[in-house]
């Protein structure tokens, strides 16, 4: 298949509309059939629940061109399940898992020319989302919803190499105790914007959000989970009920245990113990793993000695193994790769 004539290595991580997207409506207690459309505009009532009370959830995943020329997605079933969990928490009708997977397949096939070629470092980013489309003036769930899924090509996240990030401990909370921090709701990200802009203005790449109950444990950043590596090579990930369950983190844990033979522990991680770790990384769909060189806690620098100038050795092995699985150069566990074309 002939690909679009783009400079794939320099397209950046921005929105670029593609040919087709998928739309399905929920009305009268049931989801409609859904269909592909070329129209990228969303037309809704001025009193729609999404506009009045932010009733919305979303997902993020990618399509890849593998070494043999196939077009695949990575563990989309987990995105479908997580979106169903998010919808249920927000009193929205879950979009069925099989329908979700069919929508992903349809959008990728319809935009196959936009899937970057193997070796370019670029991918086709997929954004499924669902929102309250029916009018609501009182504070209550809407009666009508819309599920949509669009695609946009994105360039390599680490153009020219992975430069370690510097983070700061935020004075703000990302989520409330017993709140919605464990689901992928747009309102969580809106809450983090002020803290994010403030951190960037101060010269930091991202925030470190602490647990909202005691503010002594590390949770996550505005859009990624943490991975820490001990001086003995053990992988440690924070455990908390208010952390979004990252599919990338879950996959990296499997890679660490079953591909690299590393010990993995999921437990609460105290801010006070960060100086004991040799490496630190942020994991998520966009970059897989972003290395962190230091975290600044109100003027006090906490440095990670094995990742000050570049991605640390254990973090790099995790990154290379997982991206190899995604790109078809490393054997994948059964069920992880869904071939579309």
Summary of predicted features, one role per range:
Residues 117-131:
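Extended, Lys/Arg-enriched charged tracts that mediate electrostatic binding to polyanionic substrates
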Residues 107-121:
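Charged, gly/pro-rich active-site loop segments
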